[in-house]
A protein has these predicted regions:
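Positively charged n-region of N-terminal signal peptides that target proteins for export
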Residues: 1-4
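Bacterial N-terminal signal peptides
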Residues: 7-16
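A domain-start/cap signature at the N-terminus of enzymes
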Residues: 18-57, 128-143, 147, 151, ...
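Short substrate-entry loop that stabilizes the transition state in hydrolases
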Residues: 50-98, 163-164, 197-199
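Structural recognition of the beta-strand scaffold that forms the well-ordered cores
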Residues: 57-61, 85-90, 127-132, 152-158, ...
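Alpha/beta-hydrolase active-site loop
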Residues: 97-122
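The feature captures the conserved acid-bearing segment of alpha/beta-hydrolase catalytic domains
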Residues: 153-238
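Alpha/beta-hydrolase-fold serine-hydrolase catalytic core, especially in secreted/extracellular enzymes
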Residues: 222-380
């Protein structure tokens, strides 16, 4: 994974978790015991205020940036406009979505239970949008393959292609068999620029050729890495969901989702790290003049141009590199660490509050530098038992995840990022 520019990840190994967005209802899952807690997981439901009936539900399992996206106020505002709710399961129940283990039965019972406790009875049959990041980015594809009649759309974030041989969880993928597919289900794969790996993208292109009725869209999350969700990318995801609702919900209010009309879509050439390469012009499927084997499908002109504009925004700009300072000293960067920087927990006298600052560094991350874009570096929470007090102050806060998950309550993950300018990424 390539690290650089305006992204840095930090893990603080020590204690436990964060206060976040409102979730109005919760149920305990039946028929499954988590290896992480030795207890049944919990499922949390958020429904937009004043929503009388849900049009769809986006859902995920606990991992990392799922929380970051689902708690983002602007993203929730967009979902509220569409009548889309959220479900978050913690701990997760299956990275693969192997129905032979009873995973589907556990999920179906959970949805029924949430319908009962919330009063939103449509949850039993409402269209679903599986979302997953990294080690949880494979299951959305498999969930859709086993639930095509209920899957409105798929989003695999900083993760995997459908039927990939490089699963984020590091083991084998599930076999779909000869007849299972996700034809007509709009699906979005997102990969960050600073985690770019051709071997992750190529299976998505191959899948499009193997399944010509599939609707696979792709976004290179330019200027971003593996562990973050920018508001810009969140807006792209919400726009993708809006298009799926517009094109798939039946006009007569029926239950059967419509398949997307592939021929009415657009094609856009996939992103390449070689930004000097001349790109084919985005165009409707029938009029695209580029190599169709090297392009992805998009709903319409708006999504195609939104994608292409994102690539132009960061094209040929200079890199920025970030560092973290703790108690006035720059903390060493370790390229071998998945997180990049490992911090000590150095709280104030209350044992909870701690302070961090970010700085610009040279490309080796050894010295501070003045060669960078204007503006402040932003520090924010990814996941873990922490609440952000101000730009540089954080405090330990336990939240809905609880206090008794050794794996999840021992880490705090934070992100440092900078938006760049017309010269810098």
């Amino acid at each position: 994974m390539k690290r650089g520019v305006c992204i840095l990840w930090m893990v603080m190994a020590w204690l436990q978790m964060v206060c976040a967005g409102e979730w109005q209802w919760a149920v305990t899952l039946k028929g499954f015991v988590s290896d992480e807690t030795k207890k049944e997981p919990e499922a949390f439901l958020w429904v937009p205020a004043h929503c009388e009936r849900l049009s769809a539900v986006m859902w995920s399992q606990q991992n990392m940036t799922e929380e970051m996206l689902f708690d983002m106020p602007s993203f929730r505002d967009s979902l509220a406009e569409m009548g889309v709710g959220l479900i978050w399961i913690a701990p997760g129940i299956d990275q693969q979505w192997d129905v032979r283990k009873g995973t589907q039965k556990v999920f179906d019972q959970m949805v029924n239970d949430l319908a009962e406790v919330s009063g939103y009875t449509e949850l039993r049959e409402v269209p679903l949008i599986p979302f997953g990041h990294s080690a949880m980015a494979t299951f959305p594809w498999n969930f859709a393959a086993w639930n095509p009649e209920r899957t409105l759309a798929v989003v695999s974030f900083h993760g995997d292609a459908p039927r990939t041989n490089l699963c984020g969880y590091g083991r084998e993928n599930l076999e779909w068999g000869r007849t299972r597919n996700i034809d007509g289900i709009p699906s979005l794969m997102i990969e960050g620029e600073y985690e770019w790996w051709e071997a992750r993208v190529n299976p998505a292109l191959a899948f499009r050729m193997m399944y010509p009725e599939s609707c696979i869209s792709f976004l290179c999350d330019t200027g971003r890495g593996h562990f973050d969700v920018s508001e810009q990318t969140a807006r792209y995801i919400s726009r993708f969901i809006r298009k799926a609702l517009e094109q798939r919900l039946p006009a007569d209010g029926g239950k059967t989702l419509k398949k997307v009309n592939l021929a009415a879509g657009w094609l856009v050439q996939r992103w390449s790290p070689d930004e000097r390469t001349r790109r084919a012009t985005p165009a409707p499927v029938a009029r695209y003049k580029g190599d169709v084997h090297d392009a992805f499908w998009y709903f319409d002109r708006e999504m195609a141009e939104l994608t292409e504009q994102r690539y132009k925004e960061h094209k040929l700009k200079k890199m920025q590199y970030l560092g973290i300072c703790q108690q006035g000293k720059r903390v060493d960067y370790n390229p071998k660490l998945h997180a990049g920087v490992l911090l000590k927990f150095l709280p104030e006298e209350d044992g909870l509050t701690f302070h961090l600052n970010a700085c610009f560094t040279d490309s080796l991350r050894q010295e501070m530098t003045d060669e960078h874009a204007a503006g402040k570096i932003r520090l924010e929470r990814i996941c873990g038992p922490v609440e952000q007090v101000d730009d540089t102050t954080f405090t330990v806060r336990f939240y809905r995840m609880g206090m008794y998950n050794p794996r999840r309550t021992s880490d705090i993950w934070l992100l440092a990022s900078h938006p760049g300018d017309k010269h810098y990424k």
